[in-house]
Amino acid sequence: MKVTTTRFGELDIEEGKVIHMPEGMLGFVEKRFILLTPENLGPFCWLQAVDNPDLAFVVADAKNCAPGYTFALTAEECRALELSERSEAIFLLVVTMAPEPGDITVNLRGPIVLNPERLIARQIVIEGEKYTTRHPFFETSEKKQSGLQRLERQPEKSVPPAG
């Protein structure tokens, strides 16, 4: 299928690579996306709307962005994403780019949870004050040689019991 984008022009995408977000992203009506991973973007990817050439989000895998970032999915969220006990979800964070690398932030309160086997995703809103919508992407400490904070483990998910 052909997908037109304002950033990458016209792309030929396999129908089987389309990610379905039945509830869309908060504030947007689009429900079908593709994940573009250009080599020159390093840890960043583009979540491009299939039906709107102008709508794309820069995203990053949570395991590369925030140490200690954990949360549990509800049983209803696991069902909506068709996650089983053996499923491995991918947790994507929406990135706010900035001219200075030290000013790049990620939204920890609204992660996108993706079931890569079923290509179903959902944006989750984490209640409370534990996480912010503007968490620094790059390490501020000069002790880190890579400059990139790394997760020590992936966010937890709870899976409803089978039966």
UniProtKB/Swiss-Prot annotation:
Listed InterPro entries: Flagellar_assembly_factor_FliW, Flagellar_assmbl_FliW_dom_sf
Residue span of region Disordered: 136-163
Top-level taxon: Bacteria
Major localization class: cytoplasm
Pfam families per UniProt: FliW
GO BP field: bacterial-type flagellum assembly; regulation of translation
UniProt KW Cytoplasm keyword: yes
Keywords recorded for this protein, A-Z: Bacterial flagellum biogenesis, Chaperone, Cytoplasm, Translation regulation
Keyword set includes Cytoplasm: yes
Any one of the GO CC terms: cytoplasm
Subcellular location: Cytoplasm
Biased composition (Basic and acidic residues): 136-156
Task of the protein: Acts as an anti-CsrA protein, binds CsrA and prevents it from repressing translation of its target genes, one of which is flagellin. Binds to flagellin and participates in the assembly of the flagellum.
Protein family per UniProt: Belongs to the FliW family.
PANTHER family: FLAGELLAR ASSEMBLY FACTOR FLIW
Subunit record text: Interacts with translational regulator CsrA and flagellin(s).
Name the record gives this protein: Flagellar assembly factor FliW
Name of the coding gene: fliW
